[in-house]
């Protein structure tokens, strides 16, 4: 437990997509339906991260996303809300607005756009957010987007803060991740953000996985986690990791976010297209996505819309 009594994060957490209408507004019925379909197979729901397009959404749409998510989840799993922004003042303002929806955790990135290179300033940024936040804070290391990696030395200092309870690491740097794992404690959890490292991360002691794949294949990730947790034969876990790799090809179809939304569309979820300027998948890319989601060996792991027959529960 952290100093404020909050549990450290863990399990299979979904960084949720934001279904959008053609006008760029939240498609609330689709959002609520997708939440209800996925929550039974999740340990947490993370809205307004990279998969949720936070940095492109108008503030009022982001607030609606947080409000509807908390309302629809209704306490079934913890709700994580992303609040990363370009600087401290904007991050604090966003945190104030979005935590009011009733989130269980705030997920905070390093400030982006300007390159902050002083370690002390980075630490001060997160400490200021954690001091002010009414709920626990999870650090989010995603240097491919922020262009500012969180070094293990920075995370180690921040892990001592009583209101900072975990880290989502999406950098894909295994050597740094091993150092992050060494920082785990009763009050600080470490989660892997790259699904291709799921098995080795869980074997090495990671508290969970936060993967965009959980938007349509949470059962596959849960089975992989259970395989590690139950101590099943190594080959069984590796076979499940191999399935993860087969499914992950959808993220290679155009921009990864376009591939994610095209996959959900192929499964019957009308989540719309990515926010401009990211282009949607073209016809050829959509054909590859459809081939993947209709592969007999993969279909049982995928969560199709109720009116779709693209996936069948195992």
Model regions: which residues?
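C-terminal alpha-helical cap/extension of soluble enzyme domains
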Residues: 4, 8-17, 34-42, 203-206, ...
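Short alpha-helix boundary/capping motifs
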Residues: 66, 97, 126-127, 158, ...
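Secondary-structure boundary/capping signal
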Residues: 77-78, 137, 166, 188, ...
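Surface-exposed charge patches
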Residues: 96, 199, 262
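Active-site beta->alpha loop and helix N-cap motifs at the rims of alpha/beta catalytic domains
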Residues: 2-149
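Catalytic alpha/beta core domains of metabolic enzymes, predominantly
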Residues: 131, 143-252
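A general structural signal for well-ordered alpha-helical segments in protein cores
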Residues: 31, 62, 66, 91, ...
